[in-house]
Amino acid sequence: VSIHFNHTIVACHDAAASAQFWADMLGLEVGPPYGPFLPVTVDNGVTFDFAVAPGTVQDIPTAHYAFLVSEEDFDKGFARIQERGLRYWADPHAQREGEINHNDGGRGVYFFDPNGHALELLTVPYGGWPES
């Protein structure tokens, strides 16, 4: 079986601002619009398609998005978090503010986008790298 994750829609209040925030924080580019969507594409070809959610602020279901990054990209991403003065945590429950975690011998950090989605940067997958 060959199954690959292709895309997901990220609900937001302002597609252009939200896509640009993610692109800036991840060191990526916002792609050309596709219908009502503004895509941000990661290295494996998966797109995060930003679309304005109908309704009010309370209507956007927030989600958690984790990105496995290199040590160098973690450093760059963490620097962007600090440059913007964003709050960040070492855990998904926002209990360890101002810390990064060192789970499985790597580093990880959580922060929120303007829509309340939790973004995570981590350098080692949870459970560690599979043994060859």
PLM feature spans:
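Short, charged/polar surface micro-motifs in flexible loops or helix N-caps
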Residues: 44-47, 56-59, 70-75
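Hydrophobic adenine-recognition pocket in adenosine-nucleotide-binding enzymes
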Residues: 8, 65
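Conserved beta-strand in the GNAT
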Residues: 48-51, 110, 119-122
